[in-house]
Amino acid sequence: IAAGKDSDVTQVSLDTIESTTHRALVRHGCRDDIAVHVANAVRVAESNGNRICGLYYLESYCRQLETGRIDGDVDPVVSVDRPGTVRVDGRLGFAQSAFAAAFPHAVASARANGICGLSVEHTHTCTSLGYFTEQFAREGLLGIGATNATPRVAPPGGSRAVLGTNPFAMAVPDGE
């Protein structure tokens, strides 16, 4: 969905948003299978009205693919070093594809051990942290996420920025 001049609003379908995002990422050097995950995250953000984590980010993604700040052709490395923990090294690629590589391992670990800590490392911004925790909830699991980011926000009652703009997210299964 994009606002036009004089308050006219042009409706764009979520399918169009997702396919356009995918094409733009691939055109700027992202591998097809990686672009699928990022385009889906943009679609979900837009469907939730979270425009700042949706199409707003597409230009930045494309620019950073071109400059090499994001590696759009990298395979994340998943490690399961001990029960209840999963790590994925995104190797300076997209957080969405790193998460997708580790997610099945984290779900299996949580089911086998009753809990799992998943660490997604060395990736570009994850944008909406809720995108990731909601995937755990859809699997019937409680998802709690946290990120490290440049401090931009003071906590309630605080006067100094100590949190990033997307520090925490939680998703709970709805029973369906």
Residue ranges: model-predicted function:
Residues 153-176:
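Phosphate/diphosphate-binding glycine-rich loops and adjacent basic-rich segments that engage nucleotide
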Residues 40-43, 96-98, 102-121, 128:
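Alpha/propeptide regions of enzymes that mature by internal proteolysis
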Residues 4-28:
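Generic N-terminal amphipathic, Lys/Arg-enriched alpha-helix
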Residues 88-90, 111, 117-122, 143-147, ...:
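General beta-strand structural signal in soluble alpha/beta enzymes
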Residues 10-14, 30-56, 70-81:
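N-terminal glycine-rich anion-binding loops that anchor highly charged ligand groups
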Residues 67-69, 133-143, 159-166:
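A glycine- and small-aliphatic-rich helix-loop capping segment at beta-alpha/alpha-beta transitions
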Residues 54-107:
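Active-site cofactor/substrate anionic-group-binding motifs, chiefly glycine-
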